């Protein structure tokens, strides 16, 4: 067998493996990254926040983890939770603007608190997406290796 023919066969096998990975990557990433990530978010934030986590096919053999968790008014809560917020002032909208005349929240000891204006101290970012990717990507790599090896064994029979 000539060297050129051997190279062609190896290239063909490599292309088939890459195509196999690309065709199955979204399923594997869903099982290894998305579902466990949603469970983590549901436990640490809320079920509604976990439902806003998704995977998107972003190219050949590529997927991106997306989180688009928004308030009823459309505010990007996912961004505030992921990266944190600076200290900021919060004012009641007032009834004439479709809101309430006072802000309401539950204090640390469970009592109801009210104010027209508060100076919020800001929040530290939780790095939810970064943490999920860091913790779950090794499992996806292992899954790709295992599935590819199984596919190659079946394909060679």
Predicted segments with their positions:
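Extended Gly/Ser/Thr-rich low-complexity repeat segments
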Residues: 74-93
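Short, Lys/Arg-rich flexible segments
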Residues: 1-74, 97, 101-157
